């Protein structure tokens, strides 16, 4: 039966949207009215255009198990097979649907983790699998406050770029949990399609809070097998393109919205220092990675 009561949890994040969860038989899960427009190169997510009511809309699905329809009248319908857990559905809504519907409303949402340093934020950006969650956890264990590990809303106030998490979270692979966190930490499953675990750690609930000024952004490059930590400043053009590539979109093919994201990325690239950091994926080297990032931020403050 459909459920629309938001109660508590992930549905409360969809403040002005009507969200329905519909557990349907398999044959009713995928109505044949979709045209695929985008495939995620890092996972099974597919975004399609749909037209079930003559008004258009989008369907985001994860294989044949979950399909979420986003309608233009601020209505979301999530359909899923009976064997799919509510935990998986909630993760898909928070991880993929929420950032994309916010982006469709004109917000600039980055696929990025962040930690708080003093009164500002350091953003750690990169594609899925680059180690954002591992690095923000390492910073958190070293004394900086974790803001979130996946999606950041970027906004402006008096010419200053600020960041706040779309939703507070920390998800890690088992080997990172074992290497970085104490044995007493509590974890729960995230979704059947990922090996990551949700980690119960203190993450400030910043929903509604004032965004923190962004001190710098660090793009995590592909890992190197051996060698020292490398850090280089990105040109404005390089930074702009990296920001565009790391931004969420409900319709990645929408030219008008793409122009808006490009304008947001260009403004951010011109006003916030951005660096590429490259290092071996070795937990023992994370202190050196943190030191390089903090030294660069300190140098910016004294420049």
Pin down the residues of each PLM region.
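Glycine-rich, often acidic-flanked micro-motifs
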Residues: 1-11, 15, 113, 117-127, ...
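Acidic side chains
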Residues: 18, 22, 95, 149-150
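A broad, low-specificity signal for short, low-complexity segments enriched in glycine/proline
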Residues: 37-40, 75-78, 83-87, 107-108, ...
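Aromatic pocket-lining residues of Rossmann-like dinucleotide-binding sites
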Residues: 139
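Post-Walker A alpha-helix
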Residues: 135-136
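Conserved lysine of the Walker
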Residues: 132
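Long, basic/Gly/Ser/Thr-rich N-terminal segments
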Residues: 1-84, 293-303
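Extreme N-terminal, non-catalytic leader segments
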Residues: 61-67, 71-118
């Amino acid at each position: 039966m459909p459920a629309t009561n938001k109660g508590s949890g992930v549905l409360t994040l969809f403040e002005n949207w009507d969200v329905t969860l519909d557990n349907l038989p398999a044959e009713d899960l995928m109505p044949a009215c979709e045209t695929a427009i985008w495939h995620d190169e890092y996972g099974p997510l597919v975004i399609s255009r749909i037209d079930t009511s003559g008004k258009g809309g989008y369907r985001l699905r994860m294989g044949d198990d979950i399909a979420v329809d986003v309608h233009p009248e601020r209505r979301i319908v999530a359909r899923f097979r009976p064997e799919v857990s509510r935990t998986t559905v909630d993760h898909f809504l928070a991880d993929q649907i929420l950032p994309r519907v916010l982006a469709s409303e004109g917000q600039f949402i980055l696929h990025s983790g962040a930690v708080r340093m003093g009164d500002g934020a350091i953003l750690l950006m990169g594609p899925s699998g680059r180690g954002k969650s591992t690095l923000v956890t390492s910073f958190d264990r070293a004394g900086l406050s974790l803001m979130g590990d996946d999606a950041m809303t970027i906004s402006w106030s008096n010419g200053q770029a600020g960041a706040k998490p779309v939703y507070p979270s920390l998800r890690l692979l088992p080997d990172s949990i074992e290497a970085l966190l104490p044995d007493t930490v509590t974890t729960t499953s995230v979704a059947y399609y990922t090996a990551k675990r949700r980690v119960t750690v203190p993450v400030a609930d910043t929903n509604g809070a004032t965004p923190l000024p962004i001190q710098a952004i660090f793009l995590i490059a592909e890992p190197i097998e051996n060698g020292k930590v490398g850090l280089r400043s990105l040109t404005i053009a390089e930074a702009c393109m990296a920001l565009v590539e790391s931004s969420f979109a409900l319709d990645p093919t929408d030219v008008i919205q793409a122009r808006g994201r490009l304008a947001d990325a260009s403004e951010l690239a011109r006003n916030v220092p951005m660096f590429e950091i490259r290092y071996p994926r070795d937990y023992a080297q994370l202190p050196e990675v943190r030191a390089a990032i903090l030294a660069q931020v300190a140098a910016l403050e004294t420049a």
